[in-house]
Swiss-Prot record:
It comes from Bos taurus (Bovine). Expressed in cerebrum and skeletal muscle. It is a single-pass type I membrane protein. Required for the assembly and stability of the mitochondrial ubiquinol-cytochrome c reductase complex (complex III or cytochrome b-c1 complex), a multisubunit transmembrane complex that is part of the mitochondrial electron transport chain (ETC) which drives oxidative phosphorylation. This is Ubiquinol-cytochrome c reductase complex assembly factor 4.
């Protein structure tokens, strides 16, 4: 039980850690000369403030393949694919051969109906200018 802290003590310990973490100031960014010197020396791996390069790391494969991304089992088994394929084919065939209903007629009428374009009489030459219109 000596390793277990009471609730107030644990809270105080967390607060101390937070204060210690917040009091750390980030290091100043390297100046132009220092940045150029780092690039020239090639010490990028030693500087913890620079981002890691994946292409030069050991994690980067020498050659990328699809198998590495998708894994070896990228194909689904036929018993998973076939029922879905047959269900979708049956739905398309049913939609093609079914009888037309009143809902289909209404939808066709709404989609094929031509809406007359609003005629703007003020655009015709010689038409009187509307009150307050800018010319």
């Amino acid at each position: 039980m000596s390793g277990v802290l009471s609730a107030p003590a644990a809270g105080a310990l967390r607060a101390l850690r937070l204060v210690r973490w917040a009091s750390r100031s980030p290091p100043p960014p390297p100046s132009g000369r220092a940045r150029a010197q780092l690039a020239a020396e090639g010490d990028e791996e030693d500087d913890p403030h620079l981002p890691l390069r994946f292409s030069s790391s050991r994690a980067a494969p020498p050659r990328w393949t699809v198998k590495q991304s998708l894994g070896t089992g990228q194909q689904r088994p036929w018993w998973v694919v076939l029922p879905l394929s047959f269900s979708l084919m049956a739905l398309v065939i049913w939609c093609f051969f079914r009888r037309e209903t009143s809902a289909d007629q209404w939808l066709r009428q709404m989609l094929l109906e031509e809406v007359p374009e609003p005629s703007d009489a003020s655009e015709k030459p010689g038409a009187p200018v509307a009150h307050g219109a800018r010319t």
